[in-house]
Amino acid sequence: MNGLGRPLPIRPLVRYSSGGRDLLARHLAAGRRVFARLDRAPAALRGTMCRSQPNYFLPLDKAGIDVFTQPCPLRLVLEGTVRGTGGLRITGEDCATTVAGLHAAGDVATRELVTGAASGGGSLNGAWAISSGTWAGRGAARFARSRGPLPPRGELRPAGRAGMRPAGPGVSRPEVDAFVAAVRDRVLPLRHNYFRTARGLTESLRLLDALWEQARDRLGALPEDGRTALRAREAAALAAHARWMYRSAPAGAESRGVHRREDRPATDPGLAHRLLVSGLDRVAVRPDPVAPRRPAEAGVP
């Protein structure tokens, strides 16, 4: 709205362009608001669109927005592994992982085995959630039965440290919240995470590595403060995931999919493989041992 209470004019950014997403991101990163309107959708198809994708139109209906005639605000959302790219590595048909007894399912598990390099959403993700949940549950049950009785409690040793068992005294909830804010400051801004450069990735890693040392040595809560203890462990997981993400990004010295390198705008055919990331204090990145087939081997001229 302008000073007179009248709506400001909306200027079209892009109509039909493969660079529409980047243009949208640049305007959002600059602090501008971006809107969309589906006014070019044929009238005969609008009802079908609403029925076939209710999850898209329902929030707009609740907000009182007719997206076919009115502009609706847009924003970019970080979805982590929800869209089928990345996740815990699956090593067997029972959704086993590289950690004995840990079977992954749903959004937390990698889905490249069923989606390839494409992002999985909608019915594909729903089918994967049901199928992988069934397979993982059976695999976990078989593993548990094969282990026999549990050893006496006194023989068990806890494995987790960061955010749970710090070397020093625990921290307060405000300190945990400040830690989360510091991690988010390197992950959420589009200038850091979407428009990537070698220099920016190096700077993000430097800050995140320092935050990880804090998570390992200081982040934790007193046993009687259960809510802060949970929040501290979540904060440590957030820092770990951010480091995995930014440690693997430099290995992809190209632009591919949603991984955009401002200093490497082209796609490198030699990097058409997945990256495996592991480790906590020292993060390792290596190519997937299953090498991709070359076009000639795949029967493509």
Regions found by a protein language model. Name each.
Residues M1-G120, P189-P301:
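Mobile, glycine/GP-rich and aromatic-enriched active-site lid/loop segments adjacent to catalytic centers
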Residues G137-R147, A253:
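A generic secondary-structure signal for well-formed alpha-helical elements
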Residues F143-T228:
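Long, amphipathic alpha-helical stalk/connector segments used for oligomerization, subunit docking
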Residues R111-A140:
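A conserved FAD-binding loop/helix module that cradles the flavin
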